[in-house]
């Protein structure tokens, strides 16, 4: 690798030998091709996706769907399994609200690790509080992290119960940098316990094959892997997706208003999660 050639792709450090950016795990710098792409959009392609039949809009809609296919290939998933969001935080909140609000009953349990990133923990705390305000009480069960920075799978095993519905996991820990053995954890879980995986720190560094991982939900952001801010990905298995309901609604939500009763007409994840104008 030629470090200087790589630096030239990033305007913030190009030609400035004194600048070394060490916070890419939080937010990566934006390379020239991405900046050029954004500039091109605003200069010559700006239109609304999936809203119109004129050539500029249909061309842009085709680009969005092409990007969806590429993300699906990146994860070894089907394009119908992929939704674009505003980032990993939004993806994780969509899991909590679109799945959790419509599938959890009194006494059900969600397993979380309080040492995970707040964006992987707070959506479940918020879900618990929201359900409580509607008269439904769920329980959050905290499991331990080893001093080495990996999950204590024995503690997870000991705290599983017949009421456990989902476990929230990080693929690579945001503080300790340890890759979690998702397959090992998955092996001790009953088949009916779902896995919501935060892949924010792994997507840009290691191969993610959702078929091998077996996670039911996978979330990550673009801003940690050289994309623009405000871009995120949510993956969901088809069979889980069919139990979800939109947490937000608007244009592009696959609703049919049948005698004042809303019905979903598609289980495509984008039809459930994406609404309004995309970033």
Task: Report residues per predicted region.
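Pyridoxal 5′-phosphate
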Residues: 1-279
């Amino acid at each position: 690798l030629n470090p200087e050639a790589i630096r030239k792709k990033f305007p913030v450090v190009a030609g400035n030998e004194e600048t070394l950016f060490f916070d890419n795990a939080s937010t990566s710098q934006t390379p020239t091709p991405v900046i050029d792409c954004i500039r091109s959009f605003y200069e010559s392609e700006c239109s609304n996706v999936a809203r119109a039949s004129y050539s500029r809009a249909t061309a842009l809609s085709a680009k969005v769907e092409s990007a969806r296919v590429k993300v699906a290939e990146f994860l070894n998933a089907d394009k119908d399994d992929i939704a674009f969001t505003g980032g990993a935080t939004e993806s994780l909140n969509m899991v909590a609200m679109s799945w959790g609000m419509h599938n959890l009953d009194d006494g059900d349990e969600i397993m979380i690790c309080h040492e995970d990133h707040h964006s992987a923990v707070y959506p479940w705390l918020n879900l618990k509080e929201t359900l409580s305000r509607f008269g439904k009480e769920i329980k959050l069960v905290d499991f331990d992290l080893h001093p080495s920075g990996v999950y204590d799978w024995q503690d997870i095993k000991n705290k599983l119960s017949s009421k456990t519905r989902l476990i929230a996991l990080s693929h690579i820990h945001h503080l300790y940098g340890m890759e979690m053995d998702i397959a090992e954890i998955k092996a001790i879980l009953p088949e009916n316990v779902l896995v919501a995986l935060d892949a924010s720190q792994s997507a840009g560094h290691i191969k993610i094959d959702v078929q091998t991982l077996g996670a039911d939900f996978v979330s990550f952001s673009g801003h940690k892997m050289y994309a623009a801010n405000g871009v995120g990905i949510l993956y969901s298995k088809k069979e889980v997706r069919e139990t979800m309901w939109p947490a937000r609604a608007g244009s592009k939500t696959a609703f049919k208003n049948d005698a004042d009763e809303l019905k979903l007409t598609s289980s495509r994840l984008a039809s459930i999660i994406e609404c309004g104008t995309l970033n």
